[in-house]
Amino acid sequence: MAKESTTIDVGEPNTMTKSTSHVVVDEKKKKGFVAAAAGGGYKRGLAVFDFLLRLAAIGITIGASSVMFTAEETLPFFTQFLQFQAGYDDFPTFQFFVIAIAIVASYLVLSLPFSIVTIVRPLAVAPRLILLISDTVVLTLTTAAAAAAASIVYLAHNGNTNTNWLPICQQFGDFCQTASTAVVAASISVAFFVLLIVISAIALKRH
């Protein structure tokens, strides 16, 4: 009586399984690479916008500080003992404004290299986090300077009847106009800093 023999070939299925697993891994790597490239391009666009905003903010803050620094007016009439003159250095708040906004402008210049790094390496977290924290601190300083100066400009235009403070802008019109321009410029820079912080927060968000 002849013996029956059974042959089981398991080599081919193993090969197919390995090939399938390699294909799955390659597909995952490909998808990850495409997602990273898309995220990097998106964040690079944000970084370029961030850099342009900083350049614009530098011009605005330098202009605001310079305009306030030149705020001065002397009335065409005077007495033997008194000359009617108004300048930014007559108000401690305006002096603080000039110094604070000058510091803000200097910070913006120093922040440009970090902004460039985020363009070159859009997925880098450290430079973006540094900018986010620093911008938040400087935003506080800018807001304080602009708000303090705005209160003095308001008093110069309207006075205060409760304390018998008379408005001076009817006499020192050019001085008040110059100071008001500086405050408006500083307020615009505050809005720019808010945008910069929002950009950094979006760039740090994980996809």
Curated annotation (Swiss-Prot):
GO terms for cellular component: plasma membrane. It holds the Pfam family CASP_dom. The chain crosses the membrane at residues 45-65, 96-116, 129-149, 182-202. The modification N-acetylalanine is found at A2. Residues 66-95, 150-181 are extracellular. One of its GO terms (biological process) is cell wall organization. The keyword Cell wall biogenesis/degradation applies. Keywords: Acetylation, Cell membrane, Cell wall biogenesis/degradation, Membrane, Transmembrane, Transmembrane helix. It is a multi-pass membrane protein. The keyword rRNA-binding does not apply. Its main location: membrane. Belongs to the Casparian strip membrane proteins (CASP) family. Regulates membrane-cell wall junctions and localized cell wall deposition. Required for establishment of the Casparian strip membrane domain (CSD) and the subsequent formation of Casparian strips, a cell wall modification of the root endodermis that determines an apoplastic barrier between the intraorganismal apoplasm and the extraorganismal apoplasm and prevents lateral diffusion. Homodimer and heterodimers. This is Casparian strip membrane protein 1. It comes from Raphanus raphanistrum.
